[in-house]
């Protein structure tokens, strides 16, 4: 729907069940998910700027004062800027999507394992563990022509943010039937 946008997802799962002996069994599952999102999407500025509203309210033509090409090449509607309020109420949605690079990538690994031992008939011990790690990276760059660069004195800027979340759990269960 939007220019300069996209989504990609890759998933994988591996499951392993093995009876090691008459009384001992091992189970494991490994999951992998990678997602990549590109573009500003339907909202930017943490929801304060609604791209769909900008598309619906954008002037379709330049009218008598501008050619259509001039209107399409401006980041902010010139009539909005002429009143002196420096209002960014009407941003050109085409120019905005072309002028913002917003890439979000997330990679998640998850591993579960369990070892079950039937000590005697009716008495079972099970130890299980889970390990999860998620790596995130967000690259945002506001080029000349974006409303963010306009607010920054018409100077482009950007940022990169990376994060990692790691979780581990373990449980041991003794069951008597």
Language model features with spans:
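Transmembrane beta-barrel architecture of outer membranes
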Residues: 7-13
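Outer-membrane beta-barrel architecture
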Residues: 15, 112-114, 118, 173-175
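An active-site-proximal structural segment forming one wall of the substrate-binding cleft
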Residues: 123
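Outer-membrane beta-barrel channels and translocator barrels
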Residues: 21, 118-120
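Surface-exposed loop/interface segments of Gram-negative outer-membrane beta-barrel transport/assembly proteins
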Residues: 2, 17-108, 126-177
């Amino acid at each position: 729907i939007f220019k300069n946008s996209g989504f990609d997802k890759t998933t994988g799962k591996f499951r392993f069940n093995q009876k090691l002996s008459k009384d001992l069994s091992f189970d494991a599952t490994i999951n992998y998910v990678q997602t990549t999102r590109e573009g500003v999407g339907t909202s930017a500025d943490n929801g304060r700027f609604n791209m769909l509203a900008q598309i619906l309210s954008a002037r379709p033509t330049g009218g008598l004062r501008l050619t259509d090409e001039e209107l399409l090449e401006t980041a902010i509607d010139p009539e909005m800027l002429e009143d002196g309020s420096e209002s960014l109420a009407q941003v050109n949605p085409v120019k905005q999507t072309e002028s913002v690079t917003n890439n979000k990538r997330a990679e998640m690994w998850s591993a579960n394992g369990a070892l079950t031992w039937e000590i005697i008939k009716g008495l079972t011990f099970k130890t299980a563990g889970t390990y999860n790690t998620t790596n995130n990276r967000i690259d945002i760059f506001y080029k000349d022509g974006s409303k963010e660069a306009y607010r920054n004195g018409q100077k482009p800027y950007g940022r990169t943010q990376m994060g990692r979340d790691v979780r581990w759990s373990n449980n041991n269960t003794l069951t008597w039937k």
